[in-house]
A protein has these predicted regions:
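Basic/polar N-terminal segments that are highly enriched at the extreme N-terminus
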Residues: 1-2, 20-22, 734
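Catalytic-domain carbohydrate-binding cleft regions of carbohydrate-active enzymes
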Residues: 24-52, 56-58, 68-614
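Solvent-exposed beta-strand/loop surfaces of large extracellular or lumenal domains
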Residues: 592-612, 711-734
Length: 734
């Protein structure tokens, strides 16, 4: 990417035009960030994003009115109720971003994009675009907007809205990495997920009960298939698709005897002992803005409650038929006296959702949504998966918090939902939240990972993931399809991995022999790569970079890579090819993961697939890839035994990252890093920098040397973390 010389200052006439439509205010926030606003009446209202403090607060360096930012000089005007912005585009200028507004394109020029959340076709529209000339723009509005990228005017990106004020940020940078860094400083850095979230999440069949779940967890262990997350779909609820804050368990399937003296004896903790972390599916139709308004007005009291999940908890709504006649009415905990038959048993008869058959719209919403979920956290739930459900519906006659029309709230809703879930869990547990939302808007990367919704795991979801990667969201995934090695290759080499069984029976041991072997091998591969993927996640938090990186991000100066989707980088050093007959190998020396074949790029290589291997995987020469011995589940962000895989043929510098894996300490810098320097045939393991709670004093390290198809492991034994350690490839190996 080349940043041209600063354009000549020529904005006097433009500012004069703008003045006719109201005051223009340009705040410089940093050398690469500006905030532009126009008012109609002398007031700068701000958006609901500002009111609810969703994006980080910014400090103003200086104030002016010029719209010349060197690499771009936009034009702006306010209409009667909305606005029009025009950003000039040069010949050949590429445009990326705009979230999941369309899965038809990756490079966005030419195209017209509707920034409005829609079910299936546009789960996460993001009003952010960046270009190959080194600038980007993000709108600070939640109203519906349109980005016309070189269609109506082939030499411009025209952004318009029927409602809202001119309020946007301009970011500049030498490449897409710098632009995403600036963008996530404006809208918020991506969170790091708890360590287990970078493993594998299994979503059970919706009609499974506690006995089947525990048995399935045992089978994952017995078959040696790594797995951490364990998600229950809506069948866990007493009332199928319960949108209310009164939800409780379907006690026909999930039992809590009142006479137990410890929650450790329940099925949830049996799952926990098998290494599985419980995730609960949620649906919502709650007026989240009521509580946000209380917070904005200083009337809400922050909760000081802390999780009691180490104690015996009997939650209202659980009834044990075995206690009938033996306990008094006060001693027995009974179900609510409802006459409606449990709808989970009638799931197939439930009609397609429409706004008029959803429940919960009239609930008292003065308390935060997360409040009613605390009882489930106390019982052992460690994650929540939020359904698109009512989030994507349009409520034309609804007033949110009694005063805001849906036109202003529709795009905002999933952002507030993720925020309340994230902050609620973090405050209550002092642990990292894992709150998964398929819907989102600008800034949601602070709170939630996303997946491609109810669209499977095919090639179009890959386009979606790349578009989100170029829109500040490093944690994107899709529903794992277990019916081919190609789809397993894609899903297990994503930023995070989940399988949705819904009504199906796709447990690995129910697949064919080849499919089972492929599933297990890919799961083990992912878990062995945990420290490498985790390091990429840390970099995503620190800089806003993707974990799965499109070629356009990594090689911005190579126009031939501008539209590439099926070849991409996983972190700094792994090249993935999927859903294609060939993989593009960039410049340099690379090693085929399976065969060790050395390949000199740039070139194209055919992807050799079979029933157990579904794509390409290459490693860059000069890389040092930290790996773990395969674990069946992950409980912390470090391990005593570590393998450092050094790929000879080029010099390189890599980084080895660790933290405790579960706490929020990483946000205050509680982590350690060590520089891994490969020069010729010598690897230097740098002294560790930083610290975190529980950090080991030393590691048991094995260096595995790779030279073509040859490998040689050298055990270093216990290596102290406080000094440099160098080791060379064995001379007799050459």
């Amino acid at each position: 990417m080349r940043t041209p010389k600063a354009l000549l200052l020529a904005t006097v006439a433009l500012v004069g035009v703008l003045a006719a439509f109201g005051e223009t205010r340009v705040e410089k926030l940093a050398d690469d960030i500006w905030h532009v606003r126009m008012s109609r009446n002398g007031e700068f209202k701000g958006s609901l994003i500002d009111r609810y403090r969703i994006w980080p607060e910014q400090k103003v360096v200086s104030v002016g009115s010029s719209l010349d930012f060197g690499v771009v000089r936009p034009e702006a005007r306010q209409t009667e109720k909305g606005f029009v912005l025009r950003f000039p585009l040069q010949e050949g200028e590429k445009v990326y971003g705009l979230g999941d507004s369309s899965r038809e394109t990756f490079q966005r020029r030419p195209g017209v994009y509707d920034i409005w959340m829609k079910n299936v076709v546009s789960y996460i529209p993001v009003p952010f675009a960046m270009t190959s000339r080194g600038w980007g723009v993000v709108l600070n509005t939640t109203f519906r907007t349109k980005f016309d990228v070189g269609v109506a005017d082939r030499n411009a990106m025209v952004v318009s809205a029927d409602e809202g004020e001119v309020d946007f940020f301009v970011v500049t940078g030498k490449d897409y990495a710098a632009l995403l860094d600036a963008y996530t400083r404006v809208t918020g850095r991506p969170c790091m997920l708890p360590c287990f979230a970078y493993g594998f999440m299994f979503q059970a069949n919706m009609y499974a009960d506690e006995f089947e779940l525990v048995n399935q967890a045992r089978l994952f262990r017995d078959y040696g298939i790594p797995c951490d997350g364990w998600d229950l779909e809506p069948g866990w609820m007493e009332y199928f698709y319960d949108f209310t804050t009164k939800k409780t368990w379907n006690t026909k399937r999930f039992h809590y005897p009142v006479y137990t003296s410890s929650m450790r004896k329940t099925w949830i903790h049996a799952l926990e002992r098998l290494g599985k972390k419980l995730c609960l599916w949620l649906c919502i139709n709650y007026d989240l803005l009521v509580y946000e308004e209380l917070c904005a007005e200083g009337k809400a009291r922050p909760s000081k409650e802390k999780s009691k999940n180490d104690k015996a908890i009997i939650v209202e709504g659980f009834f044990d038929e075995h206690t009938e006649g033996r306990f008094s009415e006060k001693e027995a905990i009974r179900l609510d006296k409802r006459t409606v038959e449990t709808r989970a048993d009638l799931a197939l008869e439930i009609p397609v959702f429409r706004p008029d058959n959803l429940t919960g719209a009239e609930q008292d919403a003065t308390e935060p949504w997360f409040q009613h979920l605390k009882k489930f956290v106390d019982q052992g739930a460690t994650a929540f998966k939020m359904d698109a459900g009512a989030q994507v519906f349009e409520w034309k006659d609804r007033l949110w918090a009694g005063k805001y029309r849906d036109a202003e709230v529709h795009n905002l809703y999933p952002l507030v939902y993720s925020k309340q879930m994230y902050q609620g869990f973090a405050t209550y547990t002092d642990r990292r939240p894992f709150v998964i939302n398929p819907d989102g808007y600008a800034g949601y990367q602070q709170f939630s990972p996303s997946w491609a919704g109810d669209t499977g795991g095919g090639p179009k979801t890959l386009v979606s993931c790349h578009n989100l990667a170029m829109s500040g969201q490093p944690h994107q995934s899709c529903d794992l399809d277990a019916d081919s090695s190609e789809r397993l290759h894609y899903a297990f080499l994503a930023s995070w991995t989940l399988q949705n069984n819904w009504y199906y029976h796709n447990e690995p041991w129910k697949l064919g022999e080849d499919e089972f072997a492929s599933f297990r091998d890919y799961a083990r591969l992912r878990y062995s790569l945990f420290p490498y993927i985790y390091g990429a996640a840390a970099k995503a938090h620190q800089r806003g970079w993707p974990i799965c990186r499109p070629f356009a991000f990594v090689y911005p100066d190579r126009p031939e890579y501008a539209d590439v989707v099926t070849s991409y980088m996983l972190g700094d050093s792994l090249l993935v090819g999927v859903y294609d007959e060939k993989v593009l190998v960039p410049e340099g020396k690379w090693f085929d993961w399976r065969t060790g074949e050395e390949v000199d790029g740039p070139c194209e290589k055919p992807i050799v697939k079979d029933a157990r291997w579904g794509g390409a995987l290459y490693v860059k020469a000069g890389a040092v890839v930290p790996r773990w011995p395969v674990k069946l589940h992950i409980d912390k962000g470090w391990n005593e035994k570590v393998e450092l895989h050094a790929y000879l043929g080029a010099d390189g510098v890599s980084e080895w990252y660790e933290d405790d894996g579960m706490s929020l300490g990483y946000m205050q810098g509680a982590h350690s890093t060590a520089k891994l320097t490969l020069e010729g045939s010598t690897l230097t393991i740098g002294a560790r920098r930083g610290e975190f709670s529980g950090m080991p004093a030393a590691h048991d390290i094995t260096v595995v040397w790779h030279k073509g198809a040859k490998t040689k492991a050298v055990e270093l034994g216990s290596v102290p973390a406080d000094r440099d350690t160098s080791v060379s490839a064995p001379w007799f190996w050459w």
